[in-house]
Amino acid sequence: MRTDFVVRGVWEPDRDCLFDTRIIHAGSPGRAAQHISYQNALNTSAREKVKLYKAAAEERRATFCPLIVTVEGIAHQSLQAFLRRIAARLSAKWHKPLSTVTNWVRVRLQFALIKAVDLRTRGSRKRWRSSGFEDGEGIATLFQR
């Protein structure tokens, strides 16, 4: 089992919580043709993740939480609960109002989502250095003995 990240003590003290993320395009033409609502698309994705990971998480005596969000930024209820928990803990730690910290957490999530979607659609910002041969013909000479 390979999840995206593990955090200890999110829901219960000294108990790991396994998180797996998914960004879906709920407004895709395929879903629109089938008249699938955003909430149904989010719930279906969450059920798929739970079905895949829950047994393995329980075997490790951990909890599992799917973090599902659409490309438009609509979050599944499990992600909303996780963000509320993070905001509450940070609010207590930083001695700031909960509303201020909640807005900060949401903005950070939105920027992370924009970055993830942008990298997914456009690719990496790093330029790939080619071998210097425009047509690729010289690459064969590099690998000859």
Residue ranges with predicted function:
Residues 1-3, 9-17, 23-145:
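Non-catalytic C-terminal interaction segments of nucleic acid-processing enzymes
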